[in-house]
Amino acid sequence: PMVLVMSRFGIALGFGEKNIGEVCRQNGVDACTFLTVVNFLTEEISAPVTNVSNCLSIEALITYLHNAHDYFLNFRLPHLRRKLLEAIAECPQDVAFVIQRFFDEYAEEVNKHMSYEEKVVFPYVRGLLEGKKDPKYNISIFRKRHDQIEMKIIELKNILIKYYPGPGSNLLNSVLFDIFATCLLYTSPSPR
């Protein structure tokens, strides 16, 4: 995930022999925040991140999440859809239609969710940073919305496993792996 994290922070490849601190400074990225995200994503146990509150840049995290949304919605989801359509091409048409529709509904839910984060959650967090608290909103509202997306991807997995009658299960297995590796990375709850 290091390369993906770098791109989400706006760090391009080709930085030579520079260390992480130098690369972060050169790109205007908070090094503590960068390392916290990398360490969190590469840990086997996703425990709450501690002892970093003094150096973590919330604005850098918001930028990271915004760039992750852009990548996921404009590159990764369309790529997964193409791969899924290829995997189900030999299915009976009615089964392929249901699977495609379900994926498209999932993608639409993810799009709505990420749009909600961009329009509601990120401004809410920025307001908190400025000392402004919105009495009509709190982060538990966001958590409830997150759980719905996770359930949708689990339903898609169950449909594919139970009802996929087509040949070539290697391609479908690859699609399932990609969907879960990618989607759960983007839709799993943020650390509390």
Regions flagged by a language model, labelled:
Residues 68-149:
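Charged, well-structured binding/catalytic surfaces in domain cores that contact anionic ligands
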Residues 38-69:
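Hydrophobic/aromatic-rich structural module bridging two neighboring secondary-structure elements via a short loop
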Residues 186-191:
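Conserved small/polar residues in nucleotide/adenosyl-binding loops
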Residues 130-183:
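An amphipathic alpha-helical core segment
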Residues 51-58, 88-99, 167-177:
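Short, charged/polar, low-complexity loop and linker segments
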Residues 1-45:
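Membrane-cytosol interface segments
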Residues 19-22, 60-61, 105, 179-182:
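A general alpha-helix detector
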